[in-house]
């Protein structure tokens, strides 16, 4: 019987590798169709890391996953990208200090995430600083 792995299992398998290198796991997606699989992982480190680091991470993570996954799969590793949609409260903390586009009503406003807390974050624009509840955010993306 072929073991099907879920996102939390992949997270647990790679967490020690990413922790040692000071890298945050932003997102994991696993897909399985007709005996083939795909694992997509988005990683982030405050000071950007290059292609060489991504290649090394790919090798290390692939070895960890191959030990558990007993079916053919491809592994895709990437960084968040410059226009990444912020998908969780946790990501506001990860991206503290970064410039974002934020939609609370119907228009985007550009500013920075100054500080992220448990239920809100401080958003700074050119002329104001406001406390924003995560529940009030319609959309947010890196800018």
From Swiss-Prot:
<dbReference type="GO" id="GO:0005829">
    <property type="term" value="C:cytosol"/>
</dbReference>
<keyword id="KW-0690">Ribosome biogenesis</keyword>
<comment type="similarity">
    <text>Belongs to the RimP family.</text>
</comment>
<dbReference type="Pfam" id="PF02576">
    <property type="entry name" value="RimP_N"/>
</dbReference>
<keyword id="KW-0963">Cytoplasm</keyword>
<dbReference type="InterPro" id="IPR028989">
    <property type="entry name" value="RimP_N"/>
</dbReference>
<dbReference type="InterPro" id="IPR003728">
    <property type="entry name" value="Ribosome_maturation_RimP"/>
</dbReference>
<protein>
    <recommendedName>
        <fullName>Ribosome maturation factor RimP</fullName>
    </recommendedName>
</protein>
<comment type="function">
    <text>Required for maturation of 30S ribosomal subunits.</text>
</comment>
<dbReference type="GO" id="GO:0006412">
    <property type="term" value="P:translation"/>
</dbReference>
<dbReference type="InterPro" id="IPR035956">
    <property type="entry name" value="RimP_N_sf"/>
</dbReference>
<dbReference type="GO" id="GO:0000028">
    <property type="term" value="P:ribosomal small subunit assembly"/>
</dbReference>
């Amino acid at each position: 019987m072929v073991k099907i792995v879920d996102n939390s299992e992949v997270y647990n398998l790679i967490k020690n590798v990413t922790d040692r290198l000071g890298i945050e796991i932003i997102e994991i997606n696993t897909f399985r169709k007709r005996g083939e699989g795909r694992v997509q992982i988005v990683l982030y480190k405050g000071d950007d890391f290059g292609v060489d680091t991504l290649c090394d991470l790919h090798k290390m993570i692939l070895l960890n996953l191959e030990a558990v996954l007993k079916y053919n799969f491809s592994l895709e590793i990437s960084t968040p990208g410059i226009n990444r949609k912020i998908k969780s409260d946790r990501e506001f903390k990860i991206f503290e200090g970064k410039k974002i586009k934020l939609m609370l009503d119907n228009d985007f406003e550009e500013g920075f995430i100054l500080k992220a807390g448990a239920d809100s974050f401080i958003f700074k624009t050119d002329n104001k600083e406001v406390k924003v509840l995560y529940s009030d955010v319609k959309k947010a993306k890196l800018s």
